[in-house]
Each structure stands twice: as C-alpha cells, then as structure tokens.
Regions:
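Active-site rim elements
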Residues: 99-103, 123-129
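Membrane-proximal basic amphipathic "stem/tether" segments
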Residues: 57-95
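Single conserved hydrophobic/aromatic residue that forms the stacking wall/gate
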Residues: 1-9, 13
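Short beta-strand-to-loop acidic/aromatic patch adjacent to the donor-nucleotide binding site
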Residues: 14-19
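Conserved donor-nucleotide/metal-binding helix-loop-beta segment in metal-dependent transferases, i.e.
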Residues: 24-59
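Conserved nucleotide-sugar donor-binding
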Residues: 104-120, 138, 146
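A recurrent flexible, glycine/aromatic-enriched loop bordering the glycosyltransferase active site
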Residues: 93-107
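C-terminal catalytic/acceptor-binding lobe
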Residues: 125-212
Length: 212
C-alpha cells in the first residue's frame, strides 16, 4: 500500500512486477495495449476452489510471518502448536469475510490504487498474521468494490500475465516453452530463472527487451 502511495504521481497505470518477470511483447505493443484499456484492472484470480489449506491461511493467526520457519524449525513447531490450539478452541476469525485469492502481481489504474490506500485500516485489521496475505488482499477487495466490473476480460489471463499454475507454483518457464510464450496474448510472463534457464531469458530479452 505504501509503495503504491509513493508511486501515485508517477503514472496512471501501476504495474507490480518482480525480478522473475519479463515482457513478452514489444514495448510499443505493451504501451498500446494499456492505452487501449485505460480503465481496466489487471488482477489474476485463482480458478481452483478455496482449499482447506487456504482456509487455514486466512481464518487462523500465524504468529511468525517475518521469520523463515524453514531456518528456525523450533519456531515452526511452536507455530504448529499455536495453530492447532486455535482450531481446538474454535478461535476462527474473519468468518464474515468472503476471501478470493490470486497472484500478487497485478496492474491497476490510479483510481483503484487510491481505493486500495483507503483500505489500509481494513487490511491491517483483517489480514494481520495471515499467511502470505499478499495473495488475498487485492482480489478480496476488488471483488467487493465498484471496480469489480472493470477487471480485464480479454484474451489471456485477467492479469495480462502468462503464469502457469498447473505445472508449478508457479511453473518456471523452460526454453521448450518459448513458442508458447511467443504465441501468448499476455503482456508479461513469470516465472523466469536465469540460473536455471539462461538461454530462455536471453532469448526473451533479445526479442522483447533489448534495452535491458
């Protein structure tokens, strides 16, 4: 939210991308695409049913969000005990919230960015100690907002990003996927790993991002 606030004066369409993302269209086509869709919100929604694991993420508190529990196994055990205790005592929060989930990488209009900023108190109250809350807050808020009807519904994913959730979490694109990426109507793609697939990354950069 604060990152969006700092960027408010920079551009009308705000893109949230990571270092594992690359453009898969020429810069002029990306610019033309967003200019042709100036009032659309590009937000991904998980098409799969809400799983018991996701229920656990949003309805119970996870007390060590800022700690990598894989490196601190004792805290991982404590976290599991606290989680089991909440279930045993039926301490289930947020039961009045209809959660939706998707990728945290999105592009949005200035209007929706400002709308998100007005919801900071709600985010802190509802999503504090939620496990990976960045996969819930944008989708949940936009689905219950005046911007719901502005979600992009054109070719490809609603986020304008080619992300393969069927083969991975997400799938790391391979060189064998190059033709699939070239045929995609999306503007960006993720996830790329230059250590594992340097040939693919360099080819994508050569085709679509020679300035990088």
């Amino acid at each position: 939210l604060h990152l969006l606030s700092r960027r408010q004066r920079q551009m009308c369409i705000r893109d949230r991308i990571s270092g594992a993302d690359l453009p898969i269209q020429p810069p002029e086509d990306i610019r033309a695409f967003f200019e042709a869709n100036p009032d659309k919100e590009f937000v991904h929604f998980d098409p799969h049913p809400f799983s018991p694991f996701n229920d656990e993420r949003v309805y119970y508190r996870h007390f060590f969000q800022n700690i990598d529990l894989r490196r601190h196994p004792v805290l991982g055990v404590i976290n599991g005990i606290l989680l089991s205790g909440q279930k045993l005592l039926r301490i289930k929060r947020n039961q009045d919230v209809h959660f939706t989930k998707g990728s945290q990488w999105f592009s949005c209009t200035d209007g929706f960015a400002r709308y998100l900023l007005t919801k900071e108190e709600w985010v802190l109250q509802v999503l504090d100690k939620t496990f990976c809350s960045d996969e819930f807050f944008v989708q949940t808020l936009i689905a219950q907002s005046p911007y719901q009807d502005k979600i992009y519904q054109g070719p490809g994913d609603t986020s304008a990003r080619a992300i393969d959730w069927d083969r991975g979490n997400p799938w790391v694109w391979k060189y064998a996927d190059l033709e699939q990426l070239k045929a995609s109507p999306c503007m960006f793609a993720r996830k790329f790993d230059i250590e594992k697939e340097p040939e693919l990354v360099h080819e994508i950069e050569r085709l679509y991002a020679p300035h990088i």
